[in-house]
Amino acid sequence: MFKFGDEKGQLKCSFCGKSQEQVRKLVAGPGVYICDECIELCNEIIEEELNDDVEFNLNNIPKPREIKKILDQYVVGQERAKKSLSVAVYNHYKRVNSDMKIDDVELQKSNILMVGPTGCGKTLLAQTLARILDVPFAITDATSLTEAGYVGEDVENILLKLIQAADYDIEKAERGIIYIDEIDKIARKSENPSITRDVSGEGVQQALLKILEGTVASVPPQGGRKHPHQEFIQIDTTNILFIAGGAFDGLDKIIKSRIDNKVMGFGADIKSKTEENVGETLKYILPEDLLRYGLIPEFIGRLPVIVTLNELVEEDLVKILTEPRNALVKQYKKFFEMDNVELEFTPEALTAIAQKALERNTGARGLRAVVEEAILDIMYDLPSEPGIAKCVITPEVIKNHKNPELIRVKDKEETA
């Protein structure tokens, strides 16, 4: 058994055995003593282990199949898009983990452009990827950006959002993901270079080039415009993954017109396929189509990985309501469960919700609004109504704002 004191009665550290006189401090615990030197050593060991845990290395990068498997839990459909993103993200972080040069082969940066209709899951895919990889993530809207010197946000402000998401840990931020939404809104107004200044279109594309490619950017710590007498945060964007997304309304017509010009060979076959829907047409996208849409060649070159997403149909929306881990129906059931009420949506009610969202042309993001409108009154009254055991949502509740079927505790006991 360890002695806490020597023959003279002096107290000793229970870990290193040094006496009270040999150390600066001796901290007492229940039946144990520890000196300041041992405390310092313990802190160093813990700090090293924490640093080892957060260090990003190849062994910690999930494989493409693993990434897609997690994406499947949150995003319904879009199989090809999920595969493409899984591979692109895996390759990006392999490049980050290497020295970007392997046997004199330079690994170039592969930013991603996501093209798909409104509400098809572009933002959700980017958010989920960041969660899987446990890296800082920031979303910005391209429509708020303007060329330096004009009213609006400088492009450097998108980096500030990432730095804030990383709690101002610059090293961590330099390996994060930035999602730029509404990227199609900064297309220039015409295919030909403009004589007049296009401060929110081509000007922004030009301003984004360096950041997308990789540069050491100076970011104002408080955001807003730069001025000469302020301090800046320096951040290297070389290893930041940029994902740009947009609906690109009208791009399908540009693709169709290109395909329609090919009247021979495989052209006729492709044409028949593209008549199906916008998502099918977008599969045949080429950089030249984006050029005609209004993106400048240099900007297209900085987004080499193009991922297209399909339009969501009724069946997809019903699955989105019920299948993902964060599905709306599961969330509302949980809320009702907290009031000891069982919530049930009939299959016909789910179809009615999907149809209403499609009518509004809002995609998956419109589902919550439809459900909220339909069950707002019952969510308001239910907590004050004792004795209700079950609430059944029927198509009439969704379509005509009728009251849901309420089953009280007594009725449930009688039918049991």
From Swiss-Prot:
One term of GO molecular function: unfolded protein binding
Residue ranges constituting the ClpX-type ZB domain according to the UniProt record: 1-54
Species this chain originates from: Halothermothrix orenii (strain H 168 / OCM 544 / DSM 9562)
Positions that bind Zn(2+): C13, C16, C35, C38
Protein name from the UniProt record: ATP-dependent Clp protease ATP-binding subunit ClpX
Residues given in the record as ATP binding sites: P117, T118, G119, C120, G121, K122, T123, L124
Subunit description: Component of the ClpX-ClpP complex. Forms a hexameric ring that, in the presence of ATP, binds to fourteen ClpP subunits assembled into a disk-like structure with a central cavity, resembling the structure of eukaryotic proteasomes.
Family matches, as Gene3D superfamilies: 1.10.8.60, ClpX chaperone, C4-type zinc finger domain, P-loop containing nucleotide triphosphate hydrolases
Keyword NAD set for record: no
GO biological process, one term: cell division
Superkingdom of origin: Bacteria
Keyword flag Zinc: yes
Similarity comment text for this entry: Belongs to the ClpX chaperone family.
Annotated function: ATP-dependent specificity component of the Clp protease. It directs the protease to specific substrates. Can perform chaperone functions in the absence of ClpP.
NCBIfam families found in the cross-reference section: clpX, PRK05342.1
GO CC field: HslUV protease complex
Species lineage: Bacteria, Bacillati, Bacillota, Clostridia, Halanaerobiales
Pfam family, one: ClpB_D2-small
Keywords linked to the UniProt accession: ATP-binding, Chaperone, Metal-binding, Nucleotide-binding, Zinc
